[in-house]
C-alpha cells in the first residue's frame, strides 16, 4: 500500500483538494490514517448488505473511490440475481476500482461507471451507499440527490450515509476537531500535513450537522433514520424506506 505523503512538504500554491492520480494512488493509506472508524464502517456495510439486499435488485455505491464498500457488500450478499453499480467521477479512482474488484472472483456482477453521481438513474435498488460522498456535493444539490435515491429504492430498502459532521455546540465542535487532528498525528501525519490538507479541503467539503442530515432524510420520505456509528466528528447513518 502506497503511503500518503501528498501534503508532507510545503506547497506554495495550495489548490483545492481533488481526487486526482496522486490521491487515487495513496487513497487506502490516506483514508485509514485520516478517517477514524473507517474500517469499522466498511465491515458493517457488508453486514448491512447481507441483511437488506434482496434478490433481483440493484445495489449502488455512489462515490465508490477504489471500491472498498462495493467489495464489502459483494462479499456478504447471499441473494441471487443482484447487480452492484459503483460510480465515481474521478477517472483514476474508477480505474483502480475496476482493477481491485476484478481481482476477486464473485458471481455478483459489478459495473464501475466514471460519472457524476447526479447523472445516474437509481432503479430497483435494495441498498444505496453514500460513503463520505454527499459532503463533496454542493449543499444545494444534496436534497435532490437524496430524493432520487429515495424514489429508486424499493420498499424496505436501505441508504447508508457516512459523513464528517459539524456540531452546533461550538465547544463540542472544536473539541472533536482537535481530537481528530490528534488522531491524524498519532497516525504519523505532521502538523504541516494536517494544516495543508485542511486548507485544501476547505472549499470543496461542506459538512452538515447530524440533525440537518436527519431532518433532510425524514423530509425526503425515509421512515426510519438513525446514526448507527460515530467516532469523533465522523460517523454513519442508516435510512430505511
Swiss-Prot record:
Lineage: Bacteria, Pseudomonadati, Pseudomonadota, Gammaproteobacteria, Pasteurellales
Name of the protein in question: Carboxy-S-adenosyl-L-methionine synthase
CDD domains: AdoMet_MTases
Biological process annotations from GO: tRNA wobble uridine modification
Subunit description: Homodimer.
EC number: 2.1.3.-
Sorted UniProt keywords: S-adenosyl-L-methionine, Transferase
Family, similarity comment: Belongs to the class I-like SAM-binding methyltransferase superfamily. Cx-SAM synthase family.
Keyword Transferase: yes
Function: Catalyzes the conversion of S-adenosyl-L-methionine (SAM) to carboxy-S-adenosyl-L-methionine (Cx-SAM).
Organism: Mannheimia succiniciproducens (strain KCTC 0769BP / MBEL55E)
Short name of any one Pfam family annotated for the protein: Methyltransf_25
Catalytic activity, as annotated: prephenate + S-adenosyl-L-methionine = carboxy-S-adenosyl-L-methionine + 3-phenylpyruvate + H2O
Record-level Gene Ontology MF annotations: carboxyl- or carbamoyltransferase activity; S-adenosyl-L-methionine binding
Name of the gene: cmoA
Matching NCBIfam families: carboxy-S-adenosyl-L-methionine synthase CmoA, PRK15451.1
Binding-site positions, S-adenosyl-L-methionine: 38, 63-65, 88-89, 116-117, 131, 198
Disulfide bonds: none
Amino acid at each position: 500500500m502506497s503511503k500518503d505523503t501528498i501534503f508532507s512538504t510545503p506547497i506554495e500554491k495550495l489548490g483545492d483538494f481533488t481526487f486526482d492520480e496522486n490521491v487515487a494512488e495513496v487513497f487506502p493509506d490516506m483514508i485509514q490514517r485520516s478517517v477514524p472508524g473507517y474500517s469499522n464502517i466498511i465491515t458493517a456495510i457488508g453486514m448491512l448488505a447481507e441483511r437488506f439486499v434482496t434478490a433481483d435488485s440493484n445495489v449502488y455505491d455512489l462515490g465508490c473511490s477504489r471500491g472498498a464498500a462495493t467489495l464489502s457488500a459483494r462479499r456478504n450478499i447471499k441473494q441471487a440475481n443482484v447487480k452492484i453499480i459503483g460510480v465515481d467521477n474521478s477517472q483514476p479512482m474508477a480505474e483502480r476500482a475496476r482493477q481491485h474488484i476484478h481481482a476477486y472472483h464473485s458471481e455478483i456482477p459489478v459495473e464501475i461507471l466514471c460519472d457524476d453521481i447526479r447523472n445516474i438513474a437509481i432503479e430497483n435498488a435494495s441498498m444505496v451507499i453514500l460513503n463520505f460522498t454527499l459532503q463533496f456535493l454542493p449543499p444545494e444539490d444534496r436534497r435532490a440527490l437524496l430524493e432520487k435515491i429515495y424514489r429508486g429504492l424499493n420498499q424496505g430498502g436501505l441508504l447508508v450515509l457516512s459523513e464528517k459532521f459539524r456540531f452546533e455546540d461550538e465547544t463540542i465542535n472544536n473539541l472533536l476537531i482537535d481530537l481528530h487532528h490528534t488522531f491524524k498525528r498519532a497516525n504519523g501525519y505532521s502538523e504541516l500535513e494536517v494544516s495543508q490538507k485542511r486548507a485544501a479541503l476547505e472549499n470543496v467539503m461542506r459538512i452538515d450537522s447530524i440533525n440537518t442530515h436527519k431532518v433532510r432524510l425524514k423530509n425526503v420520505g425515509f421512515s426510519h433514520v438513525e446514526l448507527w456509528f460515530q467516532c469523533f466528528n465522523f460517523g454513519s447513518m442508516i435510512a430505511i424506506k
